A protein has these predicted regions:
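Hydrophobic pocket/interface hotspot
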Residues: 20, 30, 54, 73, ...
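Short, highly charged C-terminal tails/helix-capping segments
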Residues: 43, 142-150
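Hydrophobic ligand-binding cavity/cleft-lining segments
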Residues: 1-40
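Structural motif
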Residues: 14, 76-78, 107-109
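Beta-strand/loop substructures that line and gate deep hydrophobic ligand-binding cavities in soluble
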Residues: 83-134
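Intrinsic-disorder/low-complexity, polar/charged segments enriched in Ser/Thr/Lys/Arg/Asp/Glu/Gln
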Residues: 4-10, 17-18, 41, 53, ...
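Short amphipathic alpha-helical signal-transduction/dimerization elements
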Residues: 25, 137-145
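Glycine-rich portal/gate segments that line the openings of hydrophobic small-molecule binding cavities
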Residues: 42-87
Length: 150
């Protein structure tokens, strides 16, 4: 039996790849769209370069309990691909390292987004990850799809 899970997601967003890519590497944008419903996010550190690191926490709005995680950027191909790791804070007792890979491809109506997350600890149900990512991707779409020129 596997001790980790892999999930894969696919969306098409009505936004250019450049804007979606930026939303993953801009601290204010990342903290706005990544936390799933019911959580706020805080980026404590973000050095978006290969080998650079980030630290972030999610806070449950109801209970005010926070959990932190962070990792390193493994691959950054502007407007096309990025890959980063995530390790949960030790207090959560969720061992191992997750790896998230995002591939962006321009299509006639926007950008195709493929996300693969590997190494999800067995204690986290895959369906909970899918739900969280679906909520996050809805928030990402709301951030990157509007064409605000001013």
């Amino acid at each position: 039996m596997s001790t980790t899970t892999i999930i894969r997601l696919h969306r098409v967003l009505r936004a250019p790849a450049e804007r979606i890519y930026r939303a993953f590497l801009d601290a204010a944008a990342f903290s706005k769209w990544l936390p799933p419903h019911g959580f706020t996010g805080t980026v404590h550190e973000m050095d978006p370069r290969v080998g650079g690191s980030y630290r972030m926490s999610f806070t449950n709005l109801t209970t005010q309990q926070s959990h932190g995680f962070g990792g390193r950027y493994l691959e950054l191909v502007p407007h096309e691909r990025l890959s980063y790791t995530a390790i949960f804070d030790a207090a959560l007792n969720l061992p191992g390292e997750m790896r998230t890979t995002v591939a962006l491809k321009a299509v006639f109506c926007g950008t195709e987004v493929h996300i693969e997350q590997q190494g999800i600890p067995a204690q986290i149900p895959a369906e909970a990850c899918y739900l969280g990512w679906q909520e996050s991707l809805t928030l990402l779409a709301q951030l990157v799809e509007p064409e605000i020129r001013q």
